[in-house]
């Protein structure tokens, strides 16, 4: 599992000042990049939302469903067998209501690898992703360092969301998860602003 190393290489290869992050197991809505670009602010990173879809819905999903964006509708997901839950709020099309929900949600705005964005200069200042980390909370650890550097987080989970496809995680192991938890704890408690195990 070398996600952090790959992401750091991609960051250095990138030519834009503002970077948007997602994962290969996620389907962005049609306004994904536009929303991140429009809401970008100095001294902030954006924390988008994700909607985990079931194994059944993931298997039934087609390219046509994605291109038409029908897969981002409550009617479609319920018809395909997606369980009812609070995640459906993230599919609201009314941007005013989505903005209100983002302001009211008690959910902390963390840096999530499936849907986040930040200024490249801020990420480089924090020395990118910590390459000691494997699967399990590696993305939000970068967010903690950004916070420690004075970069605030903006909640946009209802204004832009991605569908998260179902899949197994054979790469997940308890030892790595425990190690990651300790690194995150250290980052928070010691107010670490830059990792020694990142880009440089």
Name what the model sees in each region:
Residues 1-14, 31:
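Glycine-rich, basic loop-to-helix element that forms the pyrophosphate-binding segment
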Residues 31-80:
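Conserved donor NDP-sugar-binding/catalytic core segment of glycosyltransferases
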Residues 23-27:
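The conserved acidic donor/metal-binding loop of glycosyltransferases
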Residues 19:
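Short aromatic/hydrophobic "clamp" motif used to bind/position activated sugar donors
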Residues 159-160, 173-199:
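Catalytic core of nucleotide-sugar-dependent glycosyltransferases
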Residues 110-127, 133-151, 157:
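A short, conserved alpha-helix in the catalytic core of glycosyltransferases
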Residues 124, 149, 156-173:
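Active-site donor/metal-binding and catalytic loop motifs
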Residues 66-108:
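Short, flexible, basic/aromatic active-site loop/helix in glycosyltransferases
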């Amino acid at each position: 599992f070398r996600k952090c190393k790959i992401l750091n290489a991609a960051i250095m290869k990138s030519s834009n000042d503002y970077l948007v992050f997602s994962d290969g197991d996620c389907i962005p809505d049609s306004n994904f990049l536009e929303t991140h670009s429009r809401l970008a602010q100095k001294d902030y990173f954006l924390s988008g939302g994700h909607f985990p879809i079931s194994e059944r819905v993931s298997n039934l999903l087609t390219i046509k469903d994605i291109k038409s964006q029908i897969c981002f509708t409550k009617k479609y997901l319920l018809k395909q067998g997606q369980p009812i839950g609070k995640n459906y709020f993230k599919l609201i099309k009314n941007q005013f209501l989505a903005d209100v929900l983002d302001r009211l949600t008690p959910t902390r705005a963390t840096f999530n690898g499936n849907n986040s964005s930040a200024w490249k200069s801020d990420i480089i200042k924090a020395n990118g992703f910590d390459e000691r980390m494997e699967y399990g909370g590696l993305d939000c650890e970068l967010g903690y360092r950004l916070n420690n550097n004075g970069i605030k987080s903006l909640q946009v989970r209802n204004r832009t969301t991605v569908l998260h496809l179902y899949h197994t995680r054979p790469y997940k192991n308890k030892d790595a998860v425990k190690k990651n938890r300790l690194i995150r704890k250290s980052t928070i408690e010691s107010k670490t602003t830059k990792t020694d195990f990142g880009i440089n």
